[in-house]
Amino acid sequence: MTKRNKKNNKLYKNIKAIKLSIASNDTILNWSEGEVTKAETINYKSLKPEPGGLFDEAIFGPVKDYECACGKFKKIKYRGVRCDRCGVWVTESIVRRERMGHIALVSPVAHIWMSKELPSPSKISLVLNISYKEVEQVLYFVNYIVLDTGKIKDPKIMPFKFKEVLDLAGKGSLTTRQKMRRVIGYIFRNLIKNRSSEDYRKGKIFYESLKNSSLPFSLNDAFNYIKKYTGFRVGIGAEAILELLNKIDLNYEFSKLNDALRKAKKDSVEDAKVKKILRQLETISWFRNSKLHPKNMILHTVPVIPPDIRPIIQLDGAKFTTSDINNFYRRVIIRNDRLRRILEDGTVPAIVVNNEKRLLQESVDALFDNSSRHKPALSKDKRSLKSLTDRLKGKQGLFRHNLLGKRVDYSGRSVIVVGPELKMYEVGIPALMILKLFKPFIIHGLINKFDSNGNEIRPIASSIRQAEDMIKNQDDLIWGIVYDVIKDRPVLLNRAPTLHRLGIQAFEPRIVDGKAIRLHPLVTTAFNADFDGDQMAVHVPLSENAVNEARAILLASKHILGLKDGRPIVTPTQDMVLGNYYLTTERKGQTGEGIIFGTVHEARAAYEAGKVHLHAIVGISTKAFPNKHFEAQGTLITTVGKIIFNDVLGDNIPYINEGEFDEHACPQKFIVPPSGDVRAAIAAHQVLPAFGKKVISKLIDLLYTVVEFKDLPRILENIKALGFKYSTHSSTTVSVFDIPKYSNKQQYFDEADQQVLKYKQFYNKGLLTDDERYKRVVKLWNGVKEKVSSEIQDLIKREEYRDNSIVVMADSGARGNISNFTQLFGMRGLMSKSFNYERNNQSKIIKDTIEVPIKHSFLEGLTINEYFNSSYGARKGMTDTAMKTAKSGYMTRKLVDATHELIINHDDCGTRKGIVVEAIVETKTRSLVESLFDRIVNRYTIGPILDPETKAEIVPANSLITQELAKQICATSIKQVLVRSVIYCERENGVCQYCFGVDLSTGKLVELGTAVGVIAAQSIGEPGTQLTMRTFHTGGVSTENNLAQGFERLKQIFEVVAPKDYERCVISEVKGVVKSITTTQNAQEVLIESSVDERTYSIPFSAQLRVKVGDAVELGSKITEGSIDIRQLLRVAGIQRVRQYMIVEIQKVYRIQGIEIADKYVEIIIRQLTSLLQVTDAGSSNLFVGQLVHSHHLNELNKSLLLSGKMPVIAINQVFGIDEAASKSNSFLSAASFQDTKKILTDAAVKTQVDYLLGLKENVIIGGKIPAGTGFLTDEELAYLGAKTVQEEY
C-alpha cells in the first residue's frame, strides 16, 4: 500500500459523520479537474485515451503509474510534475478512480431526481406548487408557463395567472387560445393607435389564426407580440423553471403554507388537501433549514465520474466492452455540442432549438436515471442501459452488492462430511485447501530467517519462487511450517443461508485427507446442516485482532445455547441419541443381574469381561461417586450402562437414574440403606424408561447451570462419544420385516366410504352445498387417519415391540415419529394440492386437499392413482418450502433493517415505566400459550414484588428475576407483574442493560455492545421457515380457525395490514357493560352502555359473538371473533394496548407451532414499529403539524420548551409496518441501502441530512468498525480474551 493510500485509509477510519447535500454548479466545478469536450473515449489504433475525451489523462490522471501520456516523464522521481507537452500530472494511476471531470451545458437542465419522484410529487413541483404533470410538460417543451403577468392587472383583460401552465397541446388548448385571443384583441384595438402599422396588421392576423386552429402560426411570435405591449412573459424548459425557482421566497412560502394549514381541516391529517399542504410544508422547511437554494435543482454542469469506475475493458479477439455510463456521457456531449452550434448559428427556428434542448434534457435524464423514463435508452440487444441510479439500487446495486456484501479473499468452499473424531472447536480441512488458504503465511514460514525466539536460522526456502514450488509439489519439508501456521490461525465456517448468527462460527483447523470439510456432529443443529451434500464456506481471519475476535467470541465451543429461547442448541441427535438410549436401557433377567460393585472401575471391568450385561440391574456403592449428590448413602440400584453414562458427566451433577431426575440429588427411592436387602430391592425394582432425546436435552440444560462454562464442551464431547460407541454396540438395523403388523383399518374404510356416499346423495338432493360436502368428506377422512394413527401408537407400545429397531429409533427421538409409522403400515391419508391462497375466494373454503385419500400404506404399496396423488402432494410440499424460504428470508432482512441500530450502550437508563405481563391464554379454548414464568424470567423489575398474602418482598425494585425467584412468584396468587422493557427504555440510540435483561445465549446480564436489534430480528426471522403458509378457512362462519395463521398472520402484524373483511372483528369503542343483544332481520344488534353514553354495534349473522348480556367490556375489547385492525385499536384504545396486543398475537403465532421465542425480542421489533409520533400541535417549536418525530426527541424537546415557559408540542402515536420503519431510520445510508434508494437520497440531499453512523449498516458501508461487540473493546482486551480461550481449549 502506498503512503497516499495509507493516509486515505486513516482518513476513512476517522469519519465521524457523513453529510449529503445538493451540489451547486460551483461545487461541481470545484470537484472537476477539467472539462470533457469530446465524445471520444480511446484511440482505435494506439488504444490510448483521446485528449479532451471521456478518458483524457490530462483530466483524470495517467493510465500508467508515474508516466505521462507522451512518455516525456517516466518513473517516480518526476512525481508531482505536469508535462508541458501533453498536460498530464505525473502521479499514480489510482487517481483515475478519484478524479472527476465535468461537461459545461449550453442550456440548463433539471435533475431528474428533483423533477420525477413517483408516487409522491417531485421536489420541484412541491416548491413551485405546480402539479407534477405540469412540471413535466414545461421541462419537456410541451407547454409554456407564465413567468410574469405584465403591467395589465385586470383579470378580464389579462386572464393569465402567475405560474399558470398554458395547455396548448391537450384538451385545454381551446381555452388557452381564447384567452390569448382576448389579450391580442385588446392590444391591437386599444393599445395600437396607428391602424396602418405593421403591429396592428400582425395582431389582426394572430387574432384570426387563434380562432381557427388549423391555420399555422408561430406561438413564440404571438407571445413576443403580447410581451411587447403588456410585459407579459412566458417560458419553457428548464430555463423557465430556473427563473421561477430564483424568484421564490422560502420564508414567505413557509408562513403562507402554515396559514393555509390553520385554515384547513387541521384535525384530519388524512384529508387530501391537508396532506398536500403538509408535503409542501415539509419540503419548504427542509430547504429553509438546510440553507440550500432550490435553484440548485437545475444543473448548468454535469459531473463526469472517474474513468476507472466506468472502464473500457479489452476482450479476446480485439473486441471491447464498456460500461453503459460511457454511452450516456457520449450522448450528452454529442447533443450538447450540436445545441451549441445551433445557438451560435442564430438563424435556426425556435421550434428546432427547443427540440434540441429537450433532447439534451432527456440525455441527462437517461444518464442519471434511465429506468424511470417513459422510454428508457436501449442497447443494441434491446436491453435497458444501466444508469447511475440503477447502479445504486437493488440487489445488484452499489449498496447491497459492493458495500454491504463483498466477495471475500482467502476463502474456499467444499462439501461437508461428519467428523466424530474432532473436538467441538475443531474442523477438519483438506490439505489442498489448507495449502491454498494459508499460502502467504506458509511462504513466510519457509523463507523466514529467524525462529520464534529471534535467533538466526537457515531458511527452508531461499526465495518466494522456491517456496511456491515446494507448496505446489507438497514437499515433505513444508508440513512442519503448515502445522505451526494453522496452530495460530482459527478459521470461520459459514453455511448459507445464514439465518442467525450461529450460521458463522470459528474453529481451529486440523488437516485431513480427501477433499471434504469435516464438521463436528454437535454443531450441525446451529448451522442447520446435514451430510447429504451440503457445502460450507471457509474464511481466514487475517489480522491479529480478527484472530483474537474469532477465538474470544466466535469459537464453536462457546455457542452452547440458542439465541431465540436460551435452550441448548448443541443437543446430540440421531446416532448419538440412539447410542445413549441403548446405553441407559434397563432389562430384567440379563447376565450379571444382582451383582453389587464397589467402584465404577469394577463395573466397567466386569462389563468388558462379559460378566455383566449393559442393561442388567445391579447395585453399586454410593461411595463410588464421591462428588455426586445423593439423598442418602448406601447401595444404588442402577444398570452398568447408567454407571458408564454418569461417569462421563463430571462432578457436582446428581446421579441421573431416571428421565424425571431431581436437579439437586439422586432420590432415596433408588438407594438401599446399609442394613437393607439389596437383592430383594433389585428383584422388586421397576424397569425405568431409557434416556431419550428430551432427557438428554434437559440434562444439558442442567449441565449449563451447574458446570463451569469451560468444562461444558468436554462433557458434551463425552456424551457424543458414548452415543456413537454404543449405537455401534446396539447393532441396530432397519428391515422391512421390523415393521409391526396392523390389520384393523379396513372396517374404518368401509364405514367412511358409506358415509361419503351419503354426503354425495345429500348433495345431489340439494340438502348440502358442494362446499359443505367437501368439508365433511375431508373431516371424515382426517378422523379415520387419526383413529388408525392412535391404534398404531398403542400397538407399538406393546411389550413384543419393545426391542424393535424402528420402534426404538422413534421412542428415543433419534429418527422417525408416529406419522411415519402411520404411513409405513397404516395409511398415507389425504394429500394436499395446489391452491392460490391469496385470491379473493367467494366461498371462503380453501380446497387445497385432494378429497380421495390414499388408503394403502407404503408397506402394501400404492395403486397408480394413489401414486400420482402422492407425488402431486410431495411436489407441492417442495414448492411450498422453496416459497416459504424466500418469503421468510425477505422478512428477516426487513426486520434487521428496522432494528440494526439497537445496541446495548448503557447500564441503566433509569426509566420508571415498564410493561405489565401476565400469562398469555388462548381465550377461546382457555389453553395456555405462554406462562407467566416464561414471560418474567431473566428480566428486571420496576418496583418491588410482594407476596399478596404475607406482604413479604419476593424481588426488590430494579432487580433481576432469576429462575428461582420466578418460581416463587408463580407459586403465589400473583397474576400480573410490572417489568422493565426495551419498549420504554429511555436510551435514544440504543438500549440499556437493565431494560433488556439477561442475554439468553450466555445466561448472564447482557454485555455492553451487544447488537440486540439484529439478534432479535434473527431470532424472529430464523424460525420463519417452520411456520405454515396455509391460511385456514372453515367456511362462511368466522372462527379462530378461519383466520390467517402462521407466516401470513405474522406478515399481517409486522406490516400492520388491515385484516380482510371476513377476518376483521368488531371492537368496542367504549368502556361499559353489554346491555342487550337483539336480533333484527339483517343482523344482531349489540348495545353497550357506558357511564357517558351508549353504542350500538350491528353484527352480521356470519360473525361469531364473543360477548353476552351483562359482560363488562374494555376499550378495544373484541365483540366478535377475528383479528383486530391494529390502526383502529390505536385510535380507540391507545398505544399501550396496541403494543400488548401485538406481543400477544406474535407469541401466539410461534407458540402454537411449538416455537419458543423470548418476549424481549418481540418487544424490540414493536419498539421500532411504534416509536414515531405525528405532531398535531407544534406549540412554540420549529416543528410543523403532520411532521413525524421520534418519541425520545419529542420528550427532550418538550422538556426544554416547558422549562423555558413555552408551549409544548402535542403529538399522537403512530404504528408503522416494518417496511416503513426501516425507511424512516435516522440514517439515510441505512435506509437507502434497504429500499426506495432514490427517494431517500433525494430527501436527505434536500434537507442536508447528517448521518452520524450510529447503526451497524452505516459503518459497514464506509468500511469502519461497527459500534458493537469488540468495537467496544480495546485491542489489548481483545488479545487477552483470545489468549484466555486458547488456554481453555481441551
UniProtKB/Swiss-Prot annotation:
Q: What binding details are noted for the cofactor?
A: Binds 1 Mg(2+) ion per subunit.
Detail which positions bind Zn(2+) 2: 909, 985, 992, 995
Its EC number(s): 2.7.7.6
User: Which residues does Mg(2+) bind?
Assistant: 530, 532, 534
Which coenzyme or cofactor does it need?
Answer: Mg(2+); Zn(2+)
Q: Which UniProt keywords apply?
A: DNA-directed RNA polymerase, Magnesium, Metal-binding, Nucleotidyltransferase, Transcription, Transferase, Zinc
- Major enzyme class: transferase
Any idea which positions bind Zn(2+) 1? 68, 70, 83, 86
| Keyword Translocase recorded | no
Name the Gene Ontology biological process terms.
DNA-templated transcription
Kindly list the GO molecular function terms attached to this UniProt entry: DNA binding; DNA-directed RNA polymerase activity; magnesium ion binding; zinc ion binding
Reaction equations catalysed: RNA(n) + a ribonucleoside 5'-triphosphate = RNA(n+1) + diphosphate
InterPro entries, per database record = DNA-dir_RpoC_beta_prime, DNA-dir_RpoC_beta_prime_bact, RNA_pol_asu, RNA_pol_N, RNA_pol_Rpb1_1, RNA_pol_Rpb1_3, RNA_pol_Rpb1_3_sf, RNA_pol_Rpb1_4
Q: Which superkingdom does the taxonomy of this entry point to?
A: Bacteria
Protein family (similarity comment): Belongs to the RNA polymerase beta' chain family.
Per UniProt, subunit arrangement is: The RNAP catalytic core consists of 2 alpha, 1 beta, 1 beta' and 1 omega subunit. When a sigma factor is associated with the core the holoenzyme is formed, which can initiate transcription.
Q: What does this protein do?
A: DNA-dependent RNA polymerase catalyzes the transcription of DNA into RNA using the four ribonucleoside triphosphates as substrates.
Q: Write the protein's name.
A: DNA-directed RNA polymerase subunit beta'
Which species is this record about?
Mycoplasma pneumoniae (strain ATCC 29342 / M129 / Subtype 1)
